[in-house]
């Protein structure tokens, strides 16, 4: 914690110099010609269809945390960073690790996303290379970003169709944020045999990752876990795979499907936490009885129970 405070203080005092150093180091690594080994989107989906394995994703948000930064919906946490680095270097036979395929060809991405990554890597490429294992085969985070980032939107439909094969006639368990509500209002998961939900916080979910893991381990191992909980999903998918479960960290895939159906990726999806769109954190309550009946555990209920216990402990009863 002291190191981070000192580092942040130095950066705040000399931001231009800090950025210039990062750019110089990143240019050096770009000129070296070395790149991580990352399978493309099609190969990633096909691998998951052919192999009964779990998947964790580390996108720019997870790497920003590793670099010592913070995300809007996840505060910096040393234990989380340690876990993310462990996952990045892991080599489990029943688990794959996805990172962003952005270190070479950006052909599939739209102009806005290309611009973002070119500027981002101009500063941070050398930091990515510091942590990425150049001898490891990674898979592609873009496999779950099926619509928004694509230049050619016609690729979305066949990819969604392939994804749906993974949970066809399966008993699935979502581990998601309070306002994620995967599959509500659309048919993305309508071909699943059953749906259950474990609900975590919309923000700073890693504070409760152990509690969520305990609940998940009560589920039968024939179930398929699908996770959408930011960096906490990255960790939980990895931990569940070590316990013999199949767990897929699919992140924004439900929002991607909503945007695909509406042919517009710059809109808030009513009733769902939409962190990439302005105003997307203002979410109304969900009164859908099907959704409510699918919830088998909610961290909010446990937090409320704990508060009530504390109140009971310190309450003064009159004689």
Task: Name the predicted role of every residue range.
Residues 6-189, 315-319:
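Electropositive, gly/pro-rich neighborhoods at or near active sites that engage anionic ligands
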Residues 101, 199, 251:
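Residues at the C-termini of beta-strands that transition into short coil/loop
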Residues 171, 223-224:
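Structural motif
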Residues 171, 194, 246:
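Residues at the starts of beta-strands that form the adenosine-phosphate
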Residues 176, 228-229:
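Small/polar loops that bind or transfer phosphate-bearing groups
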Residues 179-186, 190-222:
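A mid-sequence, solvent-exposed acidic-amphipathic segment
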Residues 235-319:
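C-terminal functional extensions of proteins
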